[in-house]
């Protein structure tokens, strides 16, 4: 994963399941398979039975003969669609679909408020001690209609938050 090693989470897993061998690699996120192959030595794949990853996979299915399950941290798996593990094996691949709704809905509402309240323009004016007489025509969004394209976990959460805010 392209994040700092989660020592406390790994320690909790090890204490609960002492028979597990956990190997953590900080691998930058990339679609470049050649770079991924350099980041993870082939010998690490040989004994892997479960893989938790964003995009790093063994170069070929035979490089990980014991691999039984792959958990992606992404909501989708399209970044792996042409990989031989994805196309030529029956190894189950699970995604994190559905877990990102609250965070992305908050981002959507935040960017809507930044836009309708002209935050960027007002903040720049504030830094320069300039005060606009018309307030840059800030809009209240109560009563505005919100269109949601796609009604998955993210779209549903955006709708719930927007409704709670009077949209």
Predicted regions, residues:
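A generic structural signal for alpha->beta connector loops
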Residues: 19-21, 66-67, 90, 143, ...
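Phosphate/diphosphate ligand-binding glycine-rich loop within oxidoreductases
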Residues: 46-126, 138-139
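A generic local structural motif
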Residues: 10, 36-40, 55-59, 80-81, ...
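N-terminal glycine-/charge-rich "phosphate-binding" loop or analogous flexible N-terminal tail
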Residues: 1-48
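Short gly/ser/thr-rich secondary-structure transition/capping motifs
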Residues: 27-36, 49-55, 125-134
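Rossmann-like dinucleotide/phosphate-binding beta-alpha-beta segment
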Residues: 134-167
């Amino acid at each position: 994963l392209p994040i700092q090693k989660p020592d406390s989470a790994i320690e909790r897993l090890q204490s609960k399941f002492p028979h597990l061998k956990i190997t953590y690699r900080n691998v930058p996120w990339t679609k470049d398979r050649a770079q991924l192959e350099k980041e993870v030595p082939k010998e690490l794949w040989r004994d892997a039975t479960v893989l938790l990853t964003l995009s790093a996979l063994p170069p070929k299915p035979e490089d990980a003969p014991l691999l039984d399950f792959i958990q992606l941290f992404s909501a989708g798996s399209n970044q792996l669609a042409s990989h031989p593990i994805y196309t030529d094996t029956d190894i189950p691949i699970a995604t994190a679909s559905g877990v990102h709704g609250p965070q992305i809905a908050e981002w959507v509402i935040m960017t809507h408020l930044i836009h309708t309240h002209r935050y960027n323009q007002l903040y720049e004016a504030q830094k320069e001690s300039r005060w606009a007489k018309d307030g840059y025509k800030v809009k209240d969004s109560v009563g505005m209609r919100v269109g949601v394209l796609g009604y998955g976990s993210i779209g549903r959460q955006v709708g719930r938050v927007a409704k709670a805010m009077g949209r």
